[in-house]
């Protein structure tokens, strides 16, 4: 494909109407090289599988997890701890700790631009700046292994109705994995520290975290009740706290997959998102380290992949104190950036930004995290450190299948034109 043709396709995809993508979006599961071996829709593709090229994958990744610009931070005052990069997916509690893994015929890869700081309010404003998506994709794509990820084609790990087409040759399978340990640390800090946190305001009044699985005893907050940092009446059970951390995080991988899904509509690709698999087995195949718990009845906990995506907990840190310190560094990433979303100079709002965090708030946060790990032998206590909930698969459609079995509206104009526009040399064969 020539540079001019690539540029034209990029502009066409970027300008595709949002509502057309929303209302045209369908799960389109049958790709080139696929086969349905039984039933009334029995069909074997007459075409060979055709993998997505680098440009196609770069656009899908840009839609799923691209850096969009500086967050607005548009509250009553600039937050004490904040991220310096906005993404194409929303996040809570200083999150954005979802790494996008994917596999294709060439290998297994991960995209995690965690060290990126946005340079301006809208990172991509002009048509020329749109060209950066391919360079950014190459910059932040890391290959972990050669060859397609070996997900056993059986039940489990796959659910039976997905075995015929999931992770087939020619497909690109996206697998976003989120880190709940980071979010839990951030959430605890916000809930116990009124000065640095956004969920309680002013000095004191922090949540009193109790262990509802151990008779309601204090989960590390006891020393700060007398000082007023923690309010004895604001009781928060640990099990609910950890559930809340999951609620905060679980939107990220779903939105990433849905963004990619909408991009397939604009590009004319097939695919669908699903959770028809056992994540434990898939994460083992990806190479996640599984750590046992103090309670041997509990399943092993996926804590990370060494040097790739590491949880904020042992064994990746010598203690939970060290993990909290590291999480705070990540939470505060981008605070020193000279680029701000405000019209007022930083000197006019600097005094309004509280110290992050207070000494007492940091000490209390560490105490709660130590309590969890020392009591349960894992962090978090009741949920896994890492979660994989969604697959988003993208592939080239076989239009012959849809022409045979479906009405004309089953494929949109982008699907009908995709092969000629994106792969003219293949379409002419």
What are these regions (language model features)?
Residues 1-429:
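Acidic, surface-exposed loops and disordered segments
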């Amino acid at each position: 494909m020539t540079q001019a043709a690539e540029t034209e396709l990029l502009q066409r995809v970027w300008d595709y109407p949002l509502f057309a993508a929303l209302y045209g979006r369908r799960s389109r599961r049958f790709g080139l090289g696929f086969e349905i071996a039984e039933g009334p829709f029995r069909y074997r593709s007459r075409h060979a599988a055709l993998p997505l090229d680098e440009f196609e994958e770069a656009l899908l990744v840009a839609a799923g997890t691209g850096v969009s610009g500086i967050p607005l931070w548009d509250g009553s005052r600039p937050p004490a701890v904040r991220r310096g990069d906005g993404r194409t997916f929303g996040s809570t509690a200083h999150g954005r700790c979802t790494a996008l893994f994917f596999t294709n015929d060439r290998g297994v890869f991960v995209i995690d631009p965690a060290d990126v700081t946005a340079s301006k309010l809208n990172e991509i404003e002009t048509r020329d700046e749109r060209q950066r998506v391919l360079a950014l994709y190459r910059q932040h794509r890391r290959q972990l292994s050669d060859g397609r990820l070996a997900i056993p084609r059986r039940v489990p790990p796959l659910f039976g109705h997905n075995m015929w087409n999931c992770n087939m040759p020619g497909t690109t399978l996206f697998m976003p994995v989120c880190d709940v340990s980071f979010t839990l640390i951030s959430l605890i800090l916000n809930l116990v520290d009124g000065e640095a946190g956004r969920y309680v305001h002013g000095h004191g009044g922090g949540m009193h975290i109790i262990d509802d699985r151990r008779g309601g005893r204090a989960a590390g907050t006891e020393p700060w009740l007398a000082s007023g940092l923690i309010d004895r009446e604001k009781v928060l059970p640990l099990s609910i706290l950890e559930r809340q951390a999951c609620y905060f995080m679980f939107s990220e991988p779903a939105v990433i997959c849905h963004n990619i899904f909408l991009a397939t509509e604009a590009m004319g690709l097939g695919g669908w998102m699903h959770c028809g698999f056992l994540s434990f087995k898939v994460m083992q195949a990806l190479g996640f380290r599984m750590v046992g718990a103090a309670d041997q009845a509990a399943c092993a906990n996926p804590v990370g992949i060494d040097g790739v995506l590491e949880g904020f907990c042992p064994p990746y840190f010598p203690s939970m104190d060290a993990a909290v310190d590291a999480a705070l560094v990540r939470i505060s990433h981008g605070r020193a950036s000279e680029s701000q979303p405000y019209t007022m100079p930083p000197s006019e709002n600097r005094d309004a930004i509280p110290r992050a965090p207070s000494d007492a708030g940091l000490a209390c946060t560490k105490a709660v995290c130590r309590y969890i790990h020392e009591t349960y032998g894992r962090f978090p206590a009741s949920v896994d450190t890492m979660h994989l909930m969604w697959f988003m698969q993208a592939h080239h459609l076989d239009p012959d299948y849809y022409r045979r079995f479906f009405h004309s509206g089953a494929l949109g104009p982008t699907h009908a034109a995709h092969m000629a526009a994106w792969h003219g040399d293949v379409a002419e064969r």
